[in-house]
Amino acid sequence: LSSAQVAALTDAQLRAIETADLAAMATAGLAVLATDSISGFSTRQLGALGSDQWQALTTAQVRALTTAQVAGMATEDAAALTTDQLAALSTEQIVALTTAQWAGLDSADIAALGTDQLQAMETRDLAALDSVDLAALSSTQAAALSAAQWRAVETADFGAISTLALAAVSTDAIAGLSTLQLSALGSDQWGALTSDQLRSLTTAQIAGITTEDLGALTTDRS
């Protein structure tokens, strides 16, 4: 079918298309479908799409996906979305992403997310991010995450956070970190903490600081 022919199909006709036939549809044909048509597909139909077909969808089409459709995406299909497509997801769609889908995203995908999208992430999904993903967080993104979200970050990955991002973490979030998370920080990260962040440390957190890390604190912040 040509793009013009595909665009002329009704929603009922599109829903009747067999999965094997939808998988054979040209990317140009998919890109001309109305957003209502996209949201009318079953998760089974969408599951037949290949990575090139997913990437051919416009940002408006991606944003039209229902939360059930988003949650039903295969992990490889979610990972195939472009950074522009991911950045177009609504906060409701972000919440609908499964932990497995989050784990399949790469650092460029994470770096493309807006602060409202990051704030919508479930804590279990933050825990699914690896060290490379966390290293991609900007200072603006780091500042947007809540104390509960930061507490969910795996200790093994915590040391990957850039010094710029760490310096932007809220004082409430710093005070809520576990001693194990803080123990993963390197001397350069300790040295990047602001005076306000250091003052927010609890007595238990301070007691857990190693002498090496104490030595990394600059005189104007210790």
Regions found by a protein language model. Give the residues of each.
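General marker for long, soluble alpha-helical cores
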Residues: L1-S222
